[in-house]
Amino acid sequence: MKLTCMVIVAVLFLTANTFVTADDSGNGLENLFSKAHHEIKNPEASNLNKRCIPFLHPCTFFFPDCCNSICAQFICL
């Protein structure tokens, strides 16, 4: 029972985190393909190259994207 509750909470947290951190959520899918085409022409314009979290900024345990450190207690150390 406790494990089921923990799994439900984890799924809800990850779902909320996905919606909060989604890029360009206001436009939906209307500019998805044009943006992808632009990023193929110019790979340096891709947002994937710029997604690391600096030192002492908030991070998540499940998706630790710290630049040169680790995520401990929800802060990049």
Curated annotation (Swiss-Prot):
Expressed by the venom duct. The keyword Hydrolase does not apply. It comes from the Eukaryota. Disulfide bonds join C52-C67, C59-C71, C66-C76. GO terms for cellular component: extracellular region. Pfam families: Conotoxin. Its main location: secreted. Keywords: Cleavage on pair of basic residues, Disulfide bond, Ion channel impairing toxin, Knottin, Neurotoxin, Secreted, Signal, Toxin. Residues 1-22 form the signal peptide. One of its GO terms (molecular function) is ion channel inhibitor activity. Residues 23-51 form a propeptide. It is found in: Secreted. The presence of a 'disulfide through disulfide knot' structurally defines this protein as a knottin. Belongs to the conotoxin O1 superfamily. This is Conotoxin Vc6c. It comes from Conus victoriae (Queen Victoria cone).
